[in-house]
């Protein structure tokens, strides 16, 4: 249900994949919207709207991830066939296949400057350099790799598994540091300034490590009604937005950090928050939920949403265009829709 107190806008355009959307993304030049369905199909749409440009079956048994390089004309997908695949986001042409191993390729992440692609299958991850073709393979983790996150300059990679977070040197593929936690982690993010590594835990909390890490100084923010799978950083690294329920909690990580502080609570969704995304160089936060609504917020200034967009079904993914002027969202019923900030 939409919120009658918040200005309601209609999407600029919308289409439907025919099955639930796993993830949405934008090409590096902002001209193409990419949507990947859980059935393995990928669709390419003109960002300005109009007929489907190209559609193809990317993974025979299902798709987990669908993400464009932030700097190059490359689309990466990950699926249940044990492969990560590289595509041309304009034509849909298959450019390269990368073997993940014997397991599903569940996690995939581009370095912010596009120099490396990380993807994981089972207990290992691999790093691929699009320019040189170099591939690094990690040692086995304690369990399945649950999440991957790059440092903003692309020099380091964080990987989450049972027992904590591992930090790695990207160029050499070397293990650097272990950030301990007692159980499994369900999400992972690195602040743009590299100061904080954050993860959602099985215990309905957010765990934070400040770098350089000193044992005993890790923080835990609890009180969430569900596991926190949604994490988004403001580009300044000051604000961390978290899901884990119908409310969005925004933590101020400036100065000494969030220890002992009270988060700003954003209320508006009538169901669980399922997607969060900040503009890459702006102040707007987009949120989507099981209530089929997308809200836009200026979370640093107000606890009230600026505007809302009503979609046909629960939101599964939200992503901002490279210039921050538009967003695209995917829904559980297959809807793909774009809106303006």
Where on the chain are the PLM-derived regions?
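WD40-repeat beta-propeller superdomains and closely related acidic/aromatic-rich repeat-like regions
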Residues: 1-341
């Amino acid at each position: 249900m939409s919120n009658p107190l918040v200005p309601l806008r209609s999407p600029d355009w919308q289409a439907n994949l025919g099955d639930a959307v796993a993830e949405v993304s934008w090409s590096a030049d902002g001209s193409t919207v990419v949507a990947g369905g859980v059935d393995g199909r990928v669709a390419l749409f003109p960002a300005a709207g109009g007929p489907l440009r190209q559609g193809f079956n990317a993974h025979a048994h299902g798709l987990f991830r669908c993400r464009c390089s932030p700097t190059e004309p490359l689309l990466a997908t990950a699926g249940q066939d044990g492969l990560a695949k590289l595509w041309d986001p304009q034509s849909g042409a298959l450019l390269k296949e990368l073997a993940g191993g014997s397991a599903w390729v569940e996690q995939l992440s581009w370095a912010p400057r596009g120099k490396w692609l990380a993807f994981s299958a089972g207990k290992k991850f691999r790093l691929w350099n699009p320019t040189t073709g170099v591939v690094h393979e990690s040692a086995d983790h304690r369990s399945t790799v649950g999440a991957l996150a790059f440092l903003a300059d692309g020099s380091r990679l964080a990987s989450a598994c049972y027992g904590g977070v591992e930090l790695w040197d990207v160029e050499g593929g070397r293990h650097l540091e272990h950030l301990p936690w007692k159980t499994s982690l369900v999400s992972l993010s690195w602040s743009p300034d590299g100061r904080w590594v954050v993860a959602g835990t099985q215990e309905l909390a957010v765990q934070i490590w400040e770098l350089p890490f000193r044992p005993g100084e890790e923080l835990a923010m609890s009180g969430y009604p569900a596991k926190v799978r949604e994490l988004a950083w403001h580009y300044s690294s000051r604000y961390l937005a978290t899901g884990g329920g119908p409310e969005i909690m925004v933590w101020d990580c400036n100065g000494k950090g969030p220890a002992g502080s009270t988060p700003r609570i954003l209320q508006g969704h009538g169901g669980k928050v399922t997607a969060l995304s900040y503009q890459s160089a702006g102040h707007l936060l987009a949120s989507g939920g099981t209530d089929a609504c997308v809200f836009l917020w200026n979370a640093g200034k107000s606890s009230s949403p600026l505007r809302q967009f009503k979609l046909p079904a629960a939101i599964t993914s939200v992503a901002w265009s490279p210039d921050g002027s538009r967003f695209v969202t995917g829904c559980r019923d297959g809807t793909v829709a774009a809106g303006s900030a």
